[in-house]
Structure formats: structure tokens, C-alpha cells
Amino acid sequence: MTIGIDQINFYIPQFYVDMAELAEARGVDPNKFLKGIGQTEMAVSPVSQDIVSMGANAAKDILSDDDKKAVSMVIVATESAIDSAKASAVQIHNLLGIQPFARCIEMKEACYAATPAIQLAKDYLQQRPDEKVLVIASDTARYGLESGGEPTQGAGAVAMMLSHNPRILELNDDAVPFTEDVYDFWRPTGHMLSLIHISEPTRPERI
């Protein structure tokens, strides 16, 4: 019995910042952005879009009428939540017209949240061979002007349909988790911009 990603699609806003122009404005070598982080453009979300609209746009083209009946869980992974209580998955579930007997949750852990979302979907589907799970990663990342994280900003969403007998990617059972409380990146409550601390890389010690 195999479980994995059966369909995948993405959505990015039409607006962007040219990374070479940003480098010139910041007085740095363009290759620092173009080759160093491999970016030529940085997506910018207009005020009319957020993680809900981007997530729904990413998912709508991979959902058939049969899929809408088969999806029994919607998970949105994001660090750009628009509500402290209500999951954005609930709104996306409604916009996509997915059948009502579905679980809808939101997961958060910086840029890692989509990984445990996929793992949760896999575990959930092991007991449900005829059902599907829609996993969406959607974010609007913002850093301060001229900050170290400025060139890594962006906006967009990826939607993945997980099911049995996947056509794109089969998930393995092996995984090794590791957690350490490090303030390299965080956004406290009330802050509009993310904070970043860049230090020399360290190798975690084994216990």
C-alpha cells in the first residue's frame, strides 16, 4: 500500500521585484542574489491577496468533482496566519467547495510546517484507503528594508493532493526528527515583520 503526492500545483502573485535591481539599489554584487540564493525575481503579494486566496488558487486546478468528494482533510501550513483562532483551511475548504465532512486545520513552524503536514496526512490516510488529503503551504514572508532577510522575502502557495497509489511521489517510512530552540528566525505576536539573527553555523551534538 503506497501513499504519497498524487497531484501538485502552485500559485504566485503577478507582481515581483527584480533581484538584480534590488542588488543595485542595495549596493551589493547581483550574483549574491542571482547565484547565492538562486533568485532572479521576488514575488510580492498585493493588498488584495493573502494566504487564503493564494492557497485556493494553487489548489483549484487540481481538484475534480470526485476529488472534492474524496478529500476528508485540509491542512494549511503557514507562518503568515491571518487569524489567531480560526484556521485558514476552513476558508479555503469553503472556497473550493469540498464536501462538508472534512477536518480543517492549520499548522505552524516557520518554513518546516508543510513537512509535518505531509507526514500527518500520510499517517491519516493509512487507515483510509478511499480518502484524500489536501495539503497547502501558503505564505507571505516579509522582512525589514535592508535587513539580512530582505532578499529572501516572497509570496506564494503550493497545493498537494495526497492519496493512495500516487502518480507523482511515493513517501517513505523513514524519517529522523531533530529540534533545538534557536532564535535564528522568529516573529513575535504583534510584529508585522519577521526577525532574523544570522550567526556562524554550528553542528548539533549527539546525546
Where are these regions (language model features)?
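Short acidic, glycine/serine/threonine-rich loops at helix termini
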Residues: Y16-V17, A85-A87, I118-Q119, G144-E150, ...
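Single conserved hydrophobic/aromatic residue that forms the stacking wall/gate
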Residues: I196-E200, P204-I207
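Channel- or pocket-lining gating/hinge segments that regulate access to a cavity or pore
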Residues: L162-L169
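Acidic, glycine-rich active-site loops and adjacent beta-strand->loop/helix elements
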Residues: F10-Y11, A77-D83, E109-A113, A137-R142, ...
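Conserved catalytic cysteine-centered active-site region
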Residues: K32-G36, T40-S53, E79-K132
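Flexible, glycine-rich active-site loops centered on histidine and acidic residues
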Residues: Q126-M160
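N-terminal amphipathic/basic leader segments beginning at the initiator methionine
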Residues: M1-T40
